[in-house]
Every structure is written in C-alpha cells, then in structure tokens.
C-alpha cells in the first residue's frame, strides 16, 4: 500500500469532516475539486452521476433542502491507497418526522481535493421515498 497516498486521502477527509462538523459551508466547498463527480444511487429524482463541482453541489444542496438533514456524528474516517471512507450518521425529516440514518461516503482524492464520491445510504428505499414525496 502507498502510505503517502493514504496519508493524503486521510488528510483531505479529516479536513472535510472538520468543516462538516463545524457547519463551515465555505470550508466544505473548498474541499471539492472543480471536476468533482457525485454518484447518487437509488430511484429518486436526485439519483444518477453528477459531473462537475457545480452540478454535484447543486444535487447535495437539493438533498439538504428536501431532507432538512442534520449531521449527528461522523463515527469514522478511514483511508487506503486509492479511496477513503467517511461513516456518518444524519437526521433527516420524512413528512415532518425525524429519522436517523447511517451513510457511507466513499471518496477518491485528486490534487488534495475530493474528486469523486459514492453515497451509500443505510436504507436507500427510505431515502428514495422521502425524496419522491418532497417536491417543493
């Protein structure tokens, strides 16, 4: 394993996680590469591959608006030679009812910035149903 690559990935993810915990939107946005790609699974209107920082961040902002998501905790950060992972717990709102979900966020890093993310939700069906219901 390339220790320098995993160290760089861990450094980037740790910086991102600190900004996320602090709710520092400017610092969060500075962690993304201009060519960032978001892989959002499921069958919701937000599902798909979103290429480019602007397009990907628009989807993330739309998810935040629809779900009223709130970070509860980042339980772990890990890094290997080619990917890093953040395990997060968030609260989302479904029909005004708060629900806690675990999310696994797998990242690729390039130029010391987040270059790609695969979002894996604990209950994809629940997420899809919530996103289908919220249309405003």
Language-model features: locations:
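Hydrophobic pocket/interface hotspot
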Residues: 16, 28-29, 36, 52, ...
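Short, cysteine-centered beta-strand-loop-beta hairpins and adjacent loop/turn segments enriched
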Residues: 92-100
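Short, low-complexity N-terminal intrinsically disordered segments enriched in polar/charged residues
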Residues: 1-34, 131-136
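Short beta-strand segments enriched in hydrophobic/aromatic residues
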Residues: 32, 90-92, 105, 120-121
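A short hydrophobic beta-strand element
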Residues: 81-90
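A solvent-exposed, acidic/Ser-Thr-rich amphipathic alpha-helical stretch
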Residues: 25-27, 33-81
């Amino acid at each position: 394993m390339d220790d320098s690559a995993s160290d760089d990935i861990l450094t980037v993810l740790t910086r991102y996680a600190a900004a996320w915990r602090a709710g520092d939107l400017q610092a969060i946005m500075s962690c993304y590469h201009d060519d960032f790609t978001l892989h959002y699974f499921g069958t919701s209107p937000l599902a798909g591959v979103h290429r480019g920082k602007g397009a990907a961040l628009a989807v993330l902002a739309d998810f935040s608006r629809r779900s009223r998501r709130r970070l509860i905790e980042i339980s772990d950060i890990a890094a290997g030679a080619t990917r890093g992972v953040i395990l997060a717990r968030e609260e989302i709102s479904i029909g005004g009812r708060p629900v806690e979900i675990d999310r696994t966020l797998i990242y690729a890093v390039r130029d010391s910035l987040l270059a790609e993310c695969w979002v894996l939700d604990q209950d994809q069906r629940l997420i899809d149903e919530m996103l289908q219901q919220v249309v405003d």
